[in-house]
Amino acid sequence: MLKKDSDAVKEALDQLSEVGWANKWSSQPYVSRRMTSLRELTTLGIKNAENLAIPSVRNDAAFLFTVVGTTGFLGVLAGQLPGDWGFFVPYLIGSISLVVLAVGSISPGLLQAAIGGFSSLFPDYQDRIARHEAAHFLVAYLLGLPILGYSLDIGKEHVNLIDKKLEKLIYSGQLDAKELDRLAVVAMAGLAAEGLQYDKVVGQSADLFTLQRLINRSKPQLSKEQQQNLTRWAVLFAGSLLKNNKVIHESLMSAMSKKATVLECIEAIEKAA
């Protein structure tokens, strides 16, 4: 179980399932994609379902507002300094906002890292991250995708679960409908988890990017309407799994928040089942 090899992890979990220990591993049978409406998402309990695919600007706006507001306030105070200091210091402080915008244009990654760090100040930050990543972990486990690692660290939030066979299919652009459906459900699990708990989803951008990458690597190619339906269906399926396994999801959230190992997280899933 400690091997960083997806085939070895999968084989070990299959054996544990056979002897009755890993009962939740790969326990969710395949369900083929179907037409799904926004009303079904709302009925499930997803809040503001019509806005799920719209990237949130909450963290970005709050960060930029804080930078501009703080520098503006400090600039006014600095203007009270005597002599030339009252001119040069406000000028230097005022330039901070321009520097931030310039960094965002030249190196967006640095700005996003700063915004990510700032986001941790929100009261719901830790719960959102744990809820989001635990959803990816749990849904992948239920669908039989081996988890090799995860992180809740700022700027590094992820669950590493793609196995070698699927990686080859993705890189070669040969994902079939069945595998695309399965991966789509895992990709949308974090978004679904947030949508079930909060009025607005914040961490959907990376999930939607992942889903689009998978769609682009699949055959046959999907039309825009089919892509939209796949997204809705995947959110519905993932949300249903999370609602039906709410206690397990919360137990996994707790374990991941304590930086438990992958094996300890799996134990948390099975004990809560």
List each model region and its residues.
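Soluble catalytic regions of large protease machineries
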Residues: 1-68, 73-273
